[in-house]
Design a protein with these regions (language model features):
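Non-Sec secretion/translocation targeting segments of pathogen effectors
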Residues: 327, 331-367
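Short amphipathic alpha-helix segments
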Residues: 235-248
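Extended, low-hydrophobicity segments enriched in charged/polar residues
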Residues: 5-218
């Protein structure tokens, strides 16, 4: 089956796999530019009871067909995912034009700037090294995912605020809307194993996690996971300097590995790993395990807790050189100021000496 035939089959048959209330729904498939300028086909099934509808991207489901899955099984899976994200009531989307109404719902999303040139054309964004920070309105959040609206230049013009104000507002909202967690890899793996233990042995999650932790090797963690409660757009958490400082208090200066836009790994700098080794690992993982639409960067970043700065590790020497030049320039400016001050003092003293000196009396001639 060709991909376009698959899309048409889904569009024509999806309602057969949905409840009766979707029988009269309008079914459409639209092409949508997503992260890294990936163009995906999004399925939407619109009903009269709700003014919004989930978008289900069909591209990954076709991969299942290519792997031998039956079309009916894939359609049933799409229908199940759709229903889990479906909202059965209207949402006041007109509020998105009023900054005061949506300011406490704004969140950040971190993406690669170069890979998103088309996507960024009509979006306000901030820059961090080779990354771009875009802003979204979090309309809804469930255990299955989130519903967001990306802020465009048109929306931004109506808000009447600066980009800096938008960025600050999004950072303020992060811990409320997307609470973060920072855990060692041992604990993270144990939690994954605990799910299977709880199901297979019919025990509670707390007991299952305790059992899983006993299976973990008794060695210190050298790798940590930064995540949030939705497991979506996790990389944006590193934008918050309070979070970075919290991590640094536990592990010191650290490397940040952008596993994807949804996952971030933290490795202490004193763990003995070189950034070039880590960068090679990131690049290999991106090429073999991360979907193109979820890749963030091929580079490794590091955090200087003393300076409160996050920067690309391959630019560390350049950064150090620039800081040294700035220090030299400041020293030079100070030296010039000191010399000028010394000359000024000398002139003042010289003038003061002239004003207070007593002129010598002329001798009278004796005739």
């Amino acid at each position: 089956m060709e991909y376009r035939d698959f899309v048409e089959q889904v569009k024509e048959q999806i309602q057969d796999f949905l409840p009766e209330k979707f029988a009269d729904a309008a079914v459409e498939v639209n092409q949508i530019v997503k992260n890294n300028d990936c163009v995906l086909d999004g399925l939407m099934v619109r009903t009269e009871e709700s003014n919004i509808a989930p978008t289900i991207y069909l591209n990954p489901y076709f991969e299942q067909i290519q792997d031998g899955a039956e079309l009916d099984d894939v359609l049933a899976q799409i229908a199940s995912v759709y229903q889990s994200h479906y909202i059965d009531h209207d949402i006041d989307v007109s509020a998105v034009t009023d900054f005061d109404k949506i300011k406490e719902k704004i969140v950040c999303k971190l993406i690669n700037e170069e890979a998103n040139q088309q996507f960024l054309q009509d979006k306000p964004y901030s820059k961090l090294e080779d990354l771009a920070v875009v802003y979204q309105i979090l309309m809804d959040k469930t255990g299955e995912g989130t519903a967001t609206i990306t802020i465009t230049d048109n929306l931004m013009d109506g808000y009447g605020i600066t980009l800096e104000e938008l960025h600050d507002q999004a950072l303020q909202n992060m811990d409320t809307l997307q609470p973060h967690s920072f855990k060692g890899m041992n604990e993270t793996v144990a939690e994954m194993i605990a799910v299977d233990i709880a199901r297979e042995q019919n025990v509670g999650m707390d007991e299952a996690k305790e059992m899983a932790m006993q299976m973990m090797p008794d060695i210190p963690d050298t790798m940590f996971v930064l995540t949030n409660d939705t497991k979506v757009n996790v990389a944006a958490a590193i934008l918050n300097d309070d979070i970075r400082q919290e991590i640094a208090e536990k592990v010191g200066d650290f490397y940040m590995l952008p596993s994807s836009i949804h996952e971030t790994l933290i490795i202490p700098k004193d763990a003995g790993m070189e950034f070039k080794e880590l960068e090679q690992m990131v690049q290999e993982v991106n090429q073999t395990q991360v979907a193109p639409g979820e890749r963030l960067s091929d580079h490794v970043y590091e955090y200087d807790a003393k300076e409160h700065e996050l920067f690309r590790s391959d630019r560390a020497e350049e950064r150090a050189k620039q800081k040294e030049e700035k220090r030299d320039n400041r020293h030079e400016r100070v030296s010039v100021k000191e010399k000028l001050a010394e000359k000024k003092d000398a002139v003042i003293k010289m003038n003061a000496g002239k004003e207070h000196s007593v002129p010598e009396k002329k001798k009278e001639a004796v005739i």
